Amino acid sequence: MKMAESHPDVVLSVRDLRVAFGRNSPVEVVHGVDFDIAPGEVVAVVGESGSGKSVTALSVMGLLPEGAHATGSIALHGRELLGLRPKELQQVRGAQVALISQDPVASLNPVFTIGFQVVEAVRAHDRSLGRRAARRRAVELLELVDIPDPQRRMGQYPHELSGGQCQRVGIAMALASDPRLLIADEPTTALDVTVQAEVLDVLARLGRRDGRGILLITHDMGVVADIADRVVVMRDGALVEDGPVQEVLTSPAAAYTRQLLDAVPRLGQRDEEEPAASDRLMLEVRDLVVEYGGRLRGVVRAVDDVSLDVRRGEILGLVGESGSGKSTIGRAIIGAAPVTEGGIVIDGTDMSTVSRAERTRIRRRIGVVFQNPATSLNPRYTVRESIAEPVATIGGLRGRELRERVESLLIDVDLADRRDHYPHQLSGGQRQRVAIARAVSLDPTILIADEPTSALDVSVQAQVLDVFRRLQERLRFACVFISHDLAVVDELCDRVAVLHHGRIMETGPRAQVLRRPQVAYTQRLIAAAPVPDPVLQRARRAERLAASAS
């Protein structure tokens, strides 16, 4: 085994890292990767799905799955990690290296309070601490990550916190052992832009203040520009470019890096010319109120007096932070959320005035695309079978008609060569294209797309959006596109409605709302949207920190 060169100014040193899967005929998936992380430095590893970035992070943590084998050198403060026994690796994990996961809610136990979980994390690394001392330390950690009113939050459960607050709790737990290296795996993917900015500020401050190294795994070039000092670009398991963030993002040497940057949607790129909309109203939402809860926990008004409409061939973007009510509106339209007050009119039919059977018939003409296609596809069905299912069971097609319809849809979503694959054999973008094909298979009059690209890499996102746009232009369905990514909304939508705490704050043509916002809240959302420009992102962070300090 090649031994690491110990250097006092390096937290992590990776040399000639190679990872192979399988024992009899091993397949190498990471090919000779080298990089270092200095104290207080944030190094971002970027690349598409399958690039090897997550496998590299798992190698550092010593968490490769059974059957995987790593060679080369991974040294933490000069100590070689490859070759350590499991018990020795367990002592390194948590104590010297800690992981911040992608899904902040899933990483917390829903049946225990926040305080219990942070205290347990503290005591796991220092059993000499008593319960009272561990509780004081837990409160200090919550304060460190800017959790408001930490004493009160200690008694709350994960479901009572927002996604951003749950992610901060996850960071606090990762800091419980005062690790020298933090590995942040897509830490802001599930967060809206304003919360994302706040979490990135916390990470940047913690790294620089305490001299921790941070290994950031991400596909978001705006996040890279905001927080990273250096960038490692990976493709197909190999390192294709490595350098300072300013150099890599503004003057990339590798064609692949330029390709990644070109795929990033940017606010303001699309011209301001608005397409002519049809006069036919396909969807009307009038004075909609949606409430949850009851006598025990009180009533929460998730949607408060919302009115909007969408015409044939038009895409309306719903944007806003987590908890703004945008997804609840989508669920109310498809009948999956209770309508407390107000009404929903679909293609001229008031849904509150028709029978249940008629509502079911009408809603069959509404297509839905969810954020995570893996949960909406049957793992036992091939691509062809998944697309055929709604066409046969609801559309009633059989035999040759069914085969021709499915083949046409496969071509529409560029998956004709994947017709006999199963979901686990597809990439995230390919699975989402299957979901889109299913959603449009019955020629919907309305389509609800709820964060359909938020979990995808930028180049894959661009491919999915291109498929989506082609289908919408040809089929002319009315679309409600729910997203927290303003650049994607700017690229795709015709009109935009901005939501905050269940109310519409601003609505109008896309260019008007996103170029000349009239409401302070919309202006704040736009200012928080990350862009792949390190100079601009650093200036924005300085403004944010100055505003929060005043």
Where are these regions (language model features)?
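Conserved ABC transporter NBD signature motif
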Residues: 69-80, 342-350, 362
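ABC ATPase NBD coupling module
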Residues: 81-98, 116, 124, 131, ...
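A short, proline-enriched helix->beta-strand linker immediately N-terminal to the Walker B motif
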Residues: 176-180, 441-445
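ABC ATPase "signature
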Residues: 242-243, 251, 507-508
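Conserved ABC ATPase signature
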Residues: 156-161, 165, 422-426, 430
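Conserved ABC ATPase "signature" region
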Residues: 133-152, 350, 400-417, 527
